[in-house]
Design a protein with these regions (language model features):
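ER/Golgi luminal nucleotide-sugar-dependent glycosyltransferases, focusing on the catalytic module
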Residues: 1-196
């Protein structure tokens, strides 16, 4: 059994990162004009690939969940994105590449062998020896001049705040025992971005 598998979601042809641990997976294959060679496809086995336009890289996460036995039943499962990677050796990136103010999230325009050394299998294994879970540092939306998560969501041109409100109302209705926690998140200013985690 592999100790860890980290799936990297792709929906376009980009530099493919692949190792014993890092596994590329194409998302939205059910509606894609073509399948990329040399990677897992999210339309095999039980899947929601045909709904990728609504769920984005969650179609990869669903695929891994429902097809866990096909990926070797690893102790740890993780997810990254072709444009969003953890740096497993503590590298902080170039401040000129900063994507979010005070967020420690950077744009990298060119993936080189030097860059890849930060996400090597050895660094991944070492990092996981010391923790049970890895997520991005929480990001405070006040750095983007928003009072809370709902306000930040309402500022995004591709989003509809009505959907956010329906989600909150539905979650509180279905899970009343979490009502206070849901309200705290909704009215709070801290969020975890990018759908990357292990």
């Amino acid at each position: 059994m592999e100790k860890v598998k980290i799936f990297i979601s792709y929906h376009d042809e980009h530099y493919r990162i692949k190792s014993n641990i890092l596994t590329p997976i194409q998302t939205g294959c059910a509606n894609a004009p073509r399948l990329f060679k040399g990677m897992q496809h999210d339309n095999e086995g039980e899947n929601i690939s045909d709904r990728n336009d609504k769920y984005c890289e969650l179609s990869a996460q669903y695929w891994v969940w429902k097809n866990y036995n096909k990926v070797g039943n690893p102790e740890y499962v993780g997810f990254m994105h072709y444009r969003r990677h953890f740096m497993f050796d503590g590298w902080q990136g170039n401040p000129d590449w900063c994507w979010l103010p005070k967020g420690n999230v950077y744009f990298v325009t060119n993936i080189t062998s030097g860059y890849l050394s930060h996400i090597s299998d050895e660094h991944i294994k070492q990092q996981l020896e010391n923790c049970d879970c890895i997520v991005l540092k929480p990001y405070n939306v006040r750095h983007l001049h928003s009072k809370n998560i709902r306000m930040q969501y309402s500022k995004l041109p591709e989003q509809d705040v009505h959907i956010f409100d329906v989600f909150i109302k539905t979650a509180k209705s279905l899970y009343p025992e979490y009502r206070d926690d849901i309200t705290k998140i909704e009215k709070g200013s801290v969020q975890y971005l990018s759908l990357i985690h292990i």
